[in-house]
UniProtKB/Swiss-Prot annotation:
This protein binds to 23S rRNA in the presence of protein L20. This is Large ribosomal subunit protein bL21. The lineage of its organism: Bacteria, Pseudomonadati, Pseudomonadota, Betaproteobacteria, Nitrosomonadales. One of its GO terms (biological process) is translation. Belongs to the bacterial ribosomal protein bL21 family. GO terms for molecular function: rRNA binding; structural constituent of ribosome. It comes from the Bacteria. Part of the 50S ribosomal subunit. Contacts protein L20. Keywords: Ribonucleoprotein, Ribosomal protein, RNA-binding, rRNA-binding. One of its GO terms (cellular component) is cytoplasm. It comes from Nitrosomonas europaea (strain ATCC 19718 / CIP 103999 / KCTC 2705 / NBRC 14298).
Amino acid sequence: MYAVIKTGGKQYRVEVGNKLKVETLPAEVGSDIQLDQVLMIADGEAISAGAPLLDQAKVSATVVSHGRHDKIRIFKMRRRKHYRKQQGHRQNYTEIQITGISA
């Protein structure tokens, strides 16, 4: 059984036991959360798709940790003009583990 959920403006295909890094969620480490924006659930041959969301479907997860991704470097340069600009960025994330899928 798997589901497609939407959180943080992105869509993820999840199964029970998966760990994934999503955009920062306002939850404490170790707490249980309910993700109710479920787009699709597939259970063997039966597939339920929402238009756009399924009403009664929920995915439960546990917050494992909060952290920051690796730094990416943004570098802009104009040739022959002595113009160089460098900037770095680290995105915050929340790591969750999927504990259940209910339709």
